Amino acid sequence: MKKQRNLRSMAAQAVEQVVEQGQSLSNILPPLQQKVSDKDKALLQELCFGVLRTLSQLDWLINKLMARPMSGKQRTVHYLIMVGLYQLLYTRIPPHAALAETVEGAIAIKRPQLKGLINGVLRQFQRQQEELLAEFNTSDARYLHPSWLLKRLQKAYPEQWQSIVEANNQRPPMWLRINRTHHSRDSWLALLDEAGMKGFPHADYPDAVRLETPAPVHALPGFEDGWVTVQDASAQGCMTWLAPQNGKHILDLCAAPGGKTTHILEVAPEAQVVAVDIDEQRLSRVYDNLKRLGMKATVKQGDGRYPSQWCGEQQFDRILLDAPCSATGVIRRHPDIKWLRRDRDIPELAQLQSEILDAIWPHLKSGGTLVYATCSVLPEENSLQIKAFLQRTADAELCETGTPEQPGKQNLPGAEEGDGFFYAKLIKK
């Protein structure tokens, strides 16, 4: 039996690690969830994701409620108060229970002397909630994004930035990819219906299904047998442009965790696929995905800037380059991105993408296709990146995705649509 732990203090410490130490929530959260009961795993995730999603608001409120912010060894208390405020604002947890559990969290973080302070701040918020929220709703913090990112979105999308921000602040839909080698989408939807769940097909992506209500993967018909994979609709769109074919040599570069590798093999089961990623630890997930789906590919650890180290002089018929990026198109799935990224990261990422593109292009056969993809919405990583590449690469030609002046296809995040995603299809003359 799992030891009873204070979830509020665990959430506070996790958020602190993200914001203060720059750690990814996807690395921090799973080990913490192993320490709590199945019932509490979902609440711990809700508290962590929710606080990170609304961090600007919670920070703003604390600055209004306290004369000076907690610092030094007491900094965790600042995040514990955030967890308390989040529960009062956004959850159905009865206020008395939210207060009691949050105040008790002070003991778990070895700050019992501050229980009275935490209780006082949260009760003060309850008394002043209406006027505080009215003031907050006229402040810049109401957009729940760091100012540098807000400025970039406003510049890139003067007409659409508010809808992008709004989508980023929502809970994401759950998209699935139906394994066409096992079932047609319609036949799998019938199985889903029999299981008491409802799904909606995507109009443009033939394998994509959106669940009406997110569900645990073990509840999905045939998940363990490889009938279905969790993958956002926009990520599935890569196959539209890559058009894998049996017998072709296909490189999936920056492949981890393997969602697109396995999609290639669902579309073209007899393709010769090489999956490469720089992160050896994340490659284990590529192996896991291949195993669950009963597929085979050549998996290698390697740096996209130095392909000769892992493929020699080999050339490919198709290359999918899912480039390392700011991930600004998937903020609704990973709200920690808002606080992990910095403005200075964008030119550094654009430089890295440029180096990988230049290095891998000679490994594409004449007449071959390279699909450049990112889960970013920033032009520096997307249309401007491809425009510059086309200008310096004489044998590269844009195909089907945009124009030389505005290259690529940019998806923006939407409530019933996929994540923010960019694709450019390039042909080697």
Curated annotation (Swiss-Prot):
InterPro entries from the UniProt entry: MeTrfase_RsmB-F_NOP2_cat (IPR049560), MeTrfase_RsmB-F_NOP2_dom (IPR001678), NusB-like_sf (IPR035926), NusB_RsmB_TIM44 (IPR006027), RCMT (IPR023267), rRNA_ssu_MeTfrase_B (IPR004573), rRNA_ssu_MeTfrase_B_ent (IPR023541), RsmB-like_ferredoxin (IPR054728)
Transmembrane feature ranges: none
Any one GO MF annotation of this record: RNA binding
Primary location class: cytoplasm
Keywords for this protein: Cytoplasm, Methyltransferase, RNA-binding, rRNA processing, S-adenosyl-L-methionine, Transferase
Catalytic activity as recorded in UniProt: cytidine(967) in 16S rRNA + S-adenosyl-L-methionine = 5-methylcytidine(967) in 16S rRNA + S-adenosyl-L-homocysteine + H(+)
Pfam families in alphabetical order: Methyltr_RsmB-F, NusB, RsmF-B_ferredox
Binding site for S-adenosyl-L-methionine: 254-260, 277, 303, 322
Taxonomy, superkingdom: Bacteria
Presence of keyword Cytoplasm: yes
Active site residues according to the UniProt entry: 375
Gene Ontology CC, one term: cytosol
Enzyme class: transferase
Gene Ontology biological process terms from the UniProt entry: regulation of DNA-templated transcription; rRNA base methylation
Record EC number: 2.1.1.176
Subcellular localization: Cytoplasm
Function: Specifically methylates the cytosine at position 967 (m5C967) of 16S rRNA.
HAMAP family: 16SrRNA_methyltr_B (MF_01856)
Family: Belongs to the class I-like SAM-binding methyltransferase superfamily. RsmB/NOP family.
PANTHER family per the UniProt record, alphabetical: NOL1_NOP2_SUN FAMILY PROTEIN _ ANTITERMINATION NUSB DOMAIN-CONTAINING PROTEIN, NOP2 YEAST -RELATED NOL1/NOP2/FMU SUN DOMAIN-CONTAINING
Protein name: Ribosomal RNA small subunit methyltransferase B
